[in-house]
């Protein structure tokens, strides 16, 4: 085709549909996309390099700011990586507490992804309904750790404090309220003729191409591949829970939407099971016995020399991790979120690499939107749940 007849269009970097600082230079034949060149790095913050100068516990503030829609998931994946290298084993109750927080984070992430997809397709009502439930989740986080979005939640070895009675009641209330909200949300979209026309056949990718790119998570399962890190490589006692892995068929925008909806139902089931297990165990256990990593209670710091020593050691970043290297991955809200850690036996990582699923999806994005309409490019990006903080890191 003669390029003289094509129009160059910038989608981003500050377009309201990009959900972050993305730029795509599109070649358009009318409203049809002929070619796309993505640009990355607008909010690259050199997290991996910064981590080489930080104590292990301080890196939580970096992982918090990758996929900020489900920050506790990122944090706990990092904590598990350090625990794996340091040989720290957690009590079952702590594992179950982590599962509750991780699945609440997954729901918060999925609901914002699917509701924003609705907004980009022209349906604003579902967003207004379901955001009330996101607020409930953030109130739970706030009760547990004092923060809502970038929570700094969790510690190497467990949690900074136990779930109090208010937090437990709020979790139970969310479990009681959310099914009706999710059902109403699905009724607005699942069989909506306009929404189906906008999403079915849009932004599709085959299972083979998805695997070649390195897709994982809901975007891979939407293409029909039954892969979930929680099942293939269980961590944090996920083997103790009964749940199914929803999969799609066509790998298009509609399938990605449906897979995330079904995953929220499964997450609710997992949280219910975890809460039953937590309530069956004695209260007060919320971290492993690892004084080198866990800050002692403040009243002990004022009265006991040993507690003061550990407090000083941790705050000054003098805790050392055994020499070695380890890779650990979790099923993040967007897919396999991996951490490759190399330690030279010092107080900071020698090298740290994050496997960021959004970065991988963005490489496939131009292929997925070629031949599509400009409006299809917007809903395709929404359905991939591309988060700039995770992609650029």
Swiss-Prot record:
Superkingdom in the source lineage: Bacteria
Catalysed conversion reaction: a quinone + NADH + 5 H(+)(in) = a quinol + NAD(+) + 4 H(+)(out)
Membrane topology (UniProt): Peripheral membrane protein
Entry keywords, A to Z: Cell inner membrane, Cell membrane, Membrane, NAD, Quinone, Translocase, Transport
Transmembrane annotation, as ranges: none
Family: Belongs to the complex I 49 kDa subunit family.
Function: NDH-1 shuttles electrons from NADH, via FMN and iron-sulfur (Fe-S) centers, to quinones in the respiratory chain. The immediate electron acceptor for the enzyme in this species is believed to be a menaquinone. Couples the redox reaction to proton translocation (for every two electrons transferred, four hydrogen ions are translocated across the cytoplasmic membrane), and thus conserves the redox energy in a proton gradient.
Enzyme Commission no: 7.1.1.-
Location within or outside the cell: Cell inner membrane
Gene Ontology molecular-function annotations: NAD binding; NADH:ubiquinone reductase (non-electrogenic) activity; quinone binding
Name of the protein this chain belongs to: NADH-quinone oxidoreductase subunit D 2
Native source organism of the sequence: Cytophaga hutchinsonii (strain ATCC 33406 / DSM 1761 / CIP 103989 / NBRC 15051 / NCIMB 9469 / D465)
Pfam families, per database record: Complex1_49kDa (PF00346)
InterPro entries found in the cross-reference section: NADH_Q_OxRdtase_suD, NADH_UbQ_OxRdtase_49kDa_CS, NDH1_su_D/H, NiFe-Hase_large
Oligomeric form and interacting partners: NDH-1 is composed of 14 different subunits. Subunits NuoB, C, D, E, F, and G constitute the peripheral sector of the complex.
């Amino acid at each position: 085709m003669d390029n003289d007849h094509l129009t160059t269009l910038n989608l981003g970097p500050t377009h309201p549909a990009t959900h972050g600082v993305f730029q795509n230079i599109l070649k358009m034949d009318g409203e049809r996309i002929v070619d796309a060149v993505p640009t990355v790095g607008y909010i690259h913050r050199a997290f991996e390099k910064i981590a080489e100068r930080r104590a292990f516990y301080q890196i939580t503030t970096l992982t918090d700011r990758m996929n900020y829609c489900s920050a506790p998931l990122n944090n706990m994946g990092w904590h598990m990586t350090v625990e794996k290298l340091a040989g720290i084993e957690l009590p079952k109750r702590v594992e179950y507490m982590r599962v509750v927080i991780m699945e609440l984070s997954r729901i918060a992430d999925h609901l914002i992804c699917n509701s924003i997809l609705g907004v980009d397709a022209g349906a604003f009502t579902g967003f207004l309904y379901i955001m009330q439930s996101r607020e409930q989740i953030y109130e739970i986080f706030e009760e547990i750790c004092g923060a809502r979005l970038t929570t700094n939640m969790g510690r190497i070895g467990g949690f900074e404090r136990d779930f109090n009675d208010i937090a437990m009641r709020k979790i139970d209330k969310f479990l009681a309220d959310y099914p009706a909200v999710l059902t109403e949300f699905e009724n607005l979209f699942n069989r909506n003729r306009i929404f189906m026309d906008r999403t079915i056949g849009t932004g599709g990718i085959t299972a083979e191409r998805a695997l070649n790119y390195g897709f994982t998570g809901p975007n891979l399962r939407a293409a029909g591949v039954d892969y979930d890190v929680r099942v293939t490589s269980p961590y944090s006692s996920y083997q103790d829970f009964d749940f199914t892995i929803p999969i799609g068929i066509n790998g298009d925008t509609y399938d990605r939407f449906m897979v995330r909806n079904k995953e929220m139902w499964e997450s609710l089931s997992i949280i219910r099971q975890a809460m039953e297990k937590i309530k069956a165990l004695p209260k007060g256990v919320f971290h492993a016995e690892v004084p080198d990593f866990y800050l002692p209670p403040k009243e002990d710091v004022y009265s006991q020399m040993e507690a003061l020593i550990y407090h000083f050691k941790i705050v000054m970043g003098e805790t050392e991790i055994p020499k070695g290297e380890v890779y650990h991955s979790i099923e993040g809200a967007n897919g396999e979120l991996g951490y490759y850690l190399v330690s030279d036996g010092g107080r900071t990582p020698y090298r740290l690499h994050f496997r960021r699923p959004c970065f991988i999806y963005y490489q496939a994005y131009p292929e997925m939107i070629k031949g599509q309409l400009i409006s299809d490019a917007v809903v395709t990006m929404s359905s991939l749940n591309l988060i700039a903080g995770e992609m650029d890191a």
